[in-house]
Each structure stands twice: as C-alpha cells, then as structure tokens.
Amino acid sequence: MKQQRQLRRREADETAELPADLPPLLRRLYASRGVRSARELERSVKGMLPWQQLSGIDNAVEILYNAFREGIRIIVVGDFDADGATSTALSVLGMRALGCDNISYLVPNRFEDGYGLSPEVVDQAKARGAQLIVTVDNGISSHAGVAHAKTLGIPVIVTDHHLPGDTLPDADAIINPNLRDCEFPSKSLAGVGVAFYLMLALRTFLRDKGWFDERNIAPPNLAELLDLVALGTVADVVPLDANNRILTWQGLSRIRAGKCRPGIKALLEISNRDPQQLAASDLGFALGPRLNAAGRLDDMSVGVALLLCDNLGEARVLASELDALNQTRKEIEQGMQAEALILCEKLERSSETLPGGLAMYHPEWHQGVVGILASRIKERFHRPVIAFAPAGDGTLKGSGRSIQGLHMRDALERLDTLYPDLMIKFGGHAMAAGLSLEEHKFEQFQQRFGELVTEWLDPALLQGEVISDGPLSAAEMSMEVAQLLRDAGPWGQMFPEPLFDGRFRLLQQRLVGERHLKVMVEPVGGGPLLDGIAFNIDTTCWPDNGVREVELAYKLDINEFRGNRSLQIIIDDIWPL
C-alpha cells in the first residue's frame, strides 16, 4: 500500500556566483539549493540580519527597560513544544543575565489550557504576580487573552513567528517577522530566534541607557544562548535559510566545543550522541523528540526546567524522565499508526484511490501524538494529512502536516471562508497547522478537506518524489567527501542534506532489528565496497535474495562505533533492477 516514489534529479542554478575555491561537488550542491552568492554561505555572527529590521522591537525593549527599572514582575508565557521550551528558557536566562531578578515563566498545559495566551492562562499568570506578560512562540492569535490581560491592567508583549490573521491582538508590542509591515528579510525565524533577537536589542538599549554602568556589571555575552537557538530552530522544522543557518551553525559549534547548557549535555548523553560529532539532524531526531515528549504526554515545565537548570546531576535526572516519556510516546504512536493504516485501507477500498487530503480520527488517539502521526502518514502516502484526537466536551483537536504545493494554513483559512461554522479555531504555517472542531462535524470536515486539496493540488504532486543530487563518482565515495559534506551544513528543512543516486550490485542483505535492512553493495561501474543500511524497510519486499542489482537513493555517512570510523551509506530508497 505504500506508494512507490519516483526519482528526480535536482537542478543547479547556473547563474550562481559562488567562490572559485569551493570544491566542485559543493558548488553543485549549494547552487541546486538556491545559494547564489558567497554571502549566503556566511556562518559567522557578523553575517546575521540586524535586529533593527524587526518592527515593534523598539517599543518592546522600552517596555522591558521600564519594567527592569521598576522591578515589576515579568512572566514569560511559552508553548508546549521544543521551540516554545527553548524560547521560554532563553528569555528567562537572557533577562536574568541582563540584570532582571523579578522574572518567572509559565507554560500552558496542552490538555488543560490548550495553545497560546488564553484568558485562563492570563489568570494563572496574574495569580503568580504578573505585572508584565511576554509571550514566546505564541500570542499572535491570542485576541481574547490579550484583551483579558488589559482588563486586569497587565501589559503584554507578544513575540511569535506564526502567521498572523486578518486582525492582530491589542498587545502593547508585537514582534513577529511575518507581520505584514515587518521588513525583516527572513520570514523563517523560529520562536526561539525571535526571542534571541529581542535579547540582542534589549542589551543594546540597556547599554545605551547606562544600565550596566550604573550597576557596575559587564554586558552579558548573549552568544552563550545560541545552543538553545539551534535546538529550537531545528526542532521546529523551520526553513534553514541563510540567517537560520548562521544561528544553527553557531549553536552547533558551541555544543561541539562543550559550551552548552547542562540540560543539553544531559540530553546528548541519554541520546548517545557525541557532542564533538553533532549534526543538525541530531537536534531534530534525537534531542528534539525527547524535549517534545514532555509537552506531548505530560507538562512542558519539565523540559523548561531541564534547560534552565545549572547542575548536571539534576539535568541528568530530568533528561532521564524525558527519555522515559519519549519511549512511552513511541509506543503510543506505534499503536496509533497501525490504526491509521487500517483507516487508510478502508478509504482505499471504498473509493479505489485515497483522497488528495487525508483527515483521520480515532476516539482513542492521544492529543499529544496526533502531530507525529500526521507526519508519518504524510510521509507514507505523500499527501496532506490532519489527524484528530478527542479533546473532551464533544470537541476534537487536530494536527496537520502538508507537502510542497499546499499551504496548510491557507487551506484551512479557505475552508473557514467557505464553511464558517465548520471549525472552532485554527492556526499554523505552510507545512503544519493545528485546529479544533466539534466531533459531530468530523465527517463533514473530512469530506470538505479532501475536496479542497483535490481542487488545489496538481495530481502530480501526490506522486511521491525522491529528489536526488545525482550520482557520485567512485573517487567521491570516500571518508574525505563524507566529512566534507558533514562540515558543509547545517542541513535541514528547505536546505536538505545531500542525497545521491546510483546503480549498485547487491552483494549481501539481511535484516537487523525488526525492520532495518543491512546491505553490502558495489557500484555497477566500479568503486569501493560499501556497507549500507535502510531504516524501516518494507519487510514484505526485503530482504529479497532474488535481487542482484538495485538503484539506490542514499546519503554518504560516517559510521562511528567504539572509537572507529568507517564509510557507510544511509539508504533512503531502494529499487530492484
């Protein structure tokens, strides 16, 4: 039932003006990812976009400066994912380093409070003595919460990166690169990136006002927060444009050098990751899921506490707690995925083909895991997916993931225009969105969503593609090139890790674990013998001892085991020839 994906080779921009001393392979890879100049390859902090281009930031720092001077209580209100946790921790640590003593934080509980600065969350902040609320990674759609804070006399600064609606909340200051009047060139900052920029602007403002001189303290080195910026940016799967690559590279470099928070060190240990060899993908696939598990199954306050703590022993205890939650999440997800595949089979049987957009619901699914489920089903069937779970009181909460060619939030906005009573609320980005609706309206939503996607999407986009960087020569299949590629990142969303294709003789094949295919291959045209592994293989097709030759889509990788390093390939797709 899994779709067979088609291979397509990426095309390079022939007009790109890249440095002449770049190896030809890197020139090809960068040019095919839209890099047109050496400036876009800058990885030092001097290449960062200036904070002055963020609209609303001057107003925000003035409010914070006055709050610092008056000693009023600041409450940072975060979100229950990895971006929200890193944003919250960064803001608290940053303001403490800048000289604010009266600061605390509050992270809404996914199950009790829902997303964002709701009136109920404002009441919680008020109960904790809030005299100023600063939202991070949320707030742009919190009209009711901001209005409620106003009635209580609590000013609100909104920092967010989610797409705004037609109207903005009546906050005292709003910083969001996606505001219509904001000239900040990068629209891809994560919530933690916006929070970091606010700290940079605040430091400059405080320095100009003589704040540090008055207190006889040195302005803090805010680069110490870049490990959190890198983790939140990669974990939130925002596009790694030139500016986000700088932020991520700088954070990765600090982690590799051992200059990171104890909480990040503890996450690395429990994930069995070597800090010195850390790649951006490790942040997304090892650290991020463990941090996210707190918000998915329990309370993200555990994750924020981990990132804030200064003691490695305490951090290890908290990281162990997150690791256990992540294991539980995996078990829940596995069961939900099996149920989702049964639903897909029923849909296929009823209409011969799957709808262009899948909306699925099961009364026993877990609210905190539907986002991952939607992502898994999207990858399997290559079409937009929204998965729903019960939220109590006869309502459902859904999480959607999209494919290239369909802007998920725009699609929901169109549905809301066509059918105003269909959804209770919605929000999100191009590739991910969240929504809620009444349970009895699910079948209507399922039908309308499928129809809209079918109308909007070119059917060709539903045929899964493997986009390759082409073949490697035998000489390029080496440890040196693998290391070159590792160092050439950071790779990530919209700046994908290099993927190559080629024909190989299949010399050995066997299953390891339950679903991983271990192989030894040799390039058909000659070249080195290569060990390879394909994760989560379709075990109804592999191993197949009748297959002697295959076409592979693969990544060049370095396998590190017990101090030894060897060349291997990570196989994304395998086609028998």
Question: What label would you give each PLM region?
Answer:
Residues 30, 134, 292, 485, ...:
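A residue-level signal for conserved active-site and pocket-lining positions in enzyme catalytic cores
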Residues 66, 166-176, 264, 521-528:
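Acidic-glycine-rich active-site phosphate/pyrophosphate-binding loop
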Residues 131, 172, 551:
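Conserved acidic residues
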Residues 3, 69-70, 314-360, 393, ...:
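Mid-to-C-terminal polyanion-binding domains and interfaces
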Residues 144-148, 373, 480:
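A short acidic, amphipathic alpha-helical/loop segment
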Residues 136-192:
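Histidine/acidic-residue-rich, glycine-tolerant segments that coordinate divalent metal ions
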